[in-house]
Curated annotation (Swiss-Prot):
InterPro entries the record matches: PSII_Ycf12_core-subunit (IPR010284)
Subunit structure: PSII is composed of 1 copy each of membrane proteins PsbA, PsbB, PsbC, PsbD, PsbE, PsbF, PsbH, PsbI, PsbJ, PsbK, PsbL, PsbM, PsbT, PsbY, PsbZ, Psb30/Ycf12, peripheral proteins of the oxygen-evolving complex and a large number of cofactors. It forms dimeric complexes.
One of the protein's GO biological processes: photosynthesis
The name this protein goes by in its record: Photosystem II reaction center protein Psb30
High-level lineage: Eukaryota, Discoba, Euglenozoa, Euglenida, Spirocuta
Record flagged with keyword Chloroplast: yes
Cell compartment(s), UniProt: Plastid, Chloroplast thylakoid membrane
């Protein structure tokens, strides 16, 4: 297994999961304010 490939896949999944999470957090914070 290529380490570079694993890193790329890991970062991709991280962005796909973290993206919506960050947006939701920001949305909730704005809603609370």
């Amino acid at each position: 297994m290529n380490i570079e490939l694993i890193v790329q896949l890991g970062s991709l999944t991280l962005i796909t999961i973290a993206g919506p999470l960050i947006v939701a957090l920001l949305f909730l914070r704005q809603g609370n304010l």
